[in-house]
UniProtKB/Swiss-Prot annotation:
Name of the molecule in the record: Protein RdxB
Family matches, as InterPro entries: 4Fe4S_Fe-S-bd, 4Fe4S_Fe_S_CS, Cyt_c_oxidase_cbb3_FixG, Electron_Trans/Redox, FixG_C, Ig-like_fold
Subcellular location, record wording: Cell membrane
Details of cofactor binding: Binds 2 [4Fe-4S] clusters per subunit.
Length: 477
């Protein structure tokens, strides 16, 4: 039993809404620029056209699930070439490690979709309701016509943004103009409507209401980044040695000689989209967006103090400044052993993908020997092996391919259903052709257990040849 005087505490901290104040400065301008570029690419890219010739889609970027292909301008990726996608994912991971090791959570602060869309939603919120103080007053006031009108306007605009976000996503998976007409006329596949509705709801919820909660609780990266950062990593930090002891600045009175440069104006806290105080040190919630730097620099200008009370610096630099030593240059923090290793790995994977892309053949073959039975003895005593040759024509037109065999032994080749050794494969199609290889009675290949051979496939129009090595099974006497 618990006594009436027993106090219980909850492990759950109720969320306090965060209303970032408008701020201007070089980092805010950089965030606006990155937001415009990333959103522009996301919304416009599905509408870009790229002429690939007949029998191929003309959408520049297309994930064609129906035909199991991915198009990116002049590049076409087939299902068996998924290693290109795997390579790109590896490069993305290494790039994230590189940027985090060099400059902290710059991805989170500038280019993460959660950050970009939250910035856009806050921009709409500020345009409808006003700046920070006005939004706080509106939240606290009782529901009336003005509050209802502003909230409905804001939510409607958020829903439209979410709808555009979901719509843009589905446009990447089929021809965008055609799908748009189908969506408007109700003829689109139910999956398209379900996907749009899901993304609209999640964008509306994450960008409008969850915001910083996604970064703190749902995203694993704040916890992973601890292993990527060290004392040489450049990140947003407060120069405590310069700002403390902090104190209020009264109008018309100079700062006390014993007082630090921080006047406890809370400007850095008021502009933070995460609602944290950077003066408390490094925190899991900090996304390194640097808006607190812009806000603090503006205050320092007003009170006649040098900028940089809050800035990008490494912990070793802060320690050096505290001890009166000169900090290292930013480039020496960026280009150090760890970042150079990440750069080398990233470049190596990228170079390997480029080489593989340029060396890949427009003809793809796969040869499967039939194992049951391993060979067949014909009426004249010769030995026949059977193979399934899978041909993939990656061209935009039908091609004739000639199949031949080379070996140290004397072998003959024939095709099932074709009097000649030439087969036609339609454009952008895959076809399986049964091939017979025969060794005459008493020949070395017929009597040996195994004989190496090479199957050749030649594109008669382009003169290109590819081969596949396999074996011929004999009696083994």
């Amino acid at each position: 039993m618990t006594s009436p005087d027993t106090q219980t505490s909850s492990l759950y901290a109720k969320r306090e809404p965060v209303f970032p104040k408008r701020v201007s400065g070089k980092f805010r301008s950089l965030k606006w620029w990155i937001m415009g570029v990333t959103l522009g690419i996301y919304y416009i890219a599905p509408w870009l056209r790229w002429d690939r010739g007949p029998n191929l889609p003309d959408q520049a970027i297309l994930v064609d699930l129906a035909n199991r292909r991915f198009f990116f301008f002049m590049i076409e990726i087939w299902p068996h070439e998924f290693y290109f996608v795997a390579g790109l994912l590896i490069m993305a991971g290494l790039g994230l490690f590189l940027f985090t090791s060099a400059a902290g959570r710059v991805w989170c602060g500038y280019a993460c979709p959660q950050t970009v869309w939250t910035d856009l939603f806050i921009l709409v919120e500020r345009w409808v309701e006003g700046d920070r103080n006005a939004r706080i007053r509106l939240l606290r006031q009782r529901w009336d016509l003005e509050k209802t009108r502003k909230y409905l306007t804001k939510w409607t605009l958020w829903l439209l943004i979410g709808l555009a976000t979901g719509g843009a996503w589905v446009f990447y998976f089929t021809d965008a103009p055609t799908l748009l007409v189908d969506l408007l006329t109700g003829n689109a596949h139910p999956v398209a409507y379900i996907t749009m509705a899901t993304l609209t709801a999640t964008t509306f919820a994450f960008g409008g209401f969850a915001r910083e909660q996604i970064c703190i609780y749902a995203c694993p990266w704040p916890r992973i980044q601890a292993a990527m950062m060290d004392e040489e990593t450049i990140t947003v930090a407060y120069r405590e040695w310069r700002g403390e002891p902090r104190g209020k600045l009264k109008k018309g009175e100079p700062l006390s000689p014993d007082q630090g440069d921080c006047i406890d104006c809370m400007a850095c806290v008021n502009v933070c989209p995460m609602g944290i105080d950077i003066r408390d040190g490094q925190q899991l919630a900090c996304i390194t967006c640097a808006l607190c730097i812009d806000a603090c620099d503006e205050v320092m200008d007003k009170i006649g103090k040098p900028r940089g009370l809050i800035g990008y610096l490494a912990l070793t630099d802060e320690r050096a400044e505290r001890e009166g030593r000169s900090p290292r240059s930013a480039w020496r923090h960026v280009f150090r052993l760890r970042t150079l290793i990440y750069t080398a790995l990233w470049s190596g994977v990228g170079l390997a993908l480029i080489v593989a892309l340029f060396l890949r053949s427009p003809i793809d073959i796969n040869v499967t020997p039939l194992r049951n039975p391993l060979y067949v003895t014909l009426s004249d005593g010769s030995i026949r092996n059977t193979y399934d040759v899978r041909l993939r024509n990656k061209q935009g037109e039908a091609r004739d391919y000639q199949i031949s065999v080379t070996s140290e032994a004397d072998l003959a080749l024939s095709l099932e259903g074709h009097p000649a050794t030439v087969v036609t494969v339609p454009a952008n199609e895959t076809m399986t052709q049964r091939v017979y290889i025969i060794a005459g009675k008493g020949t070395p290949a017929a009597e040996a257990e195994r004989t190496d051979l090479r199957l050749w496939v030649e594109d008669l129009a382009a003169g290109q040849r590819v081969h596949h090595d396999t074996i011929f099974n004999g009696r083994g006497n």
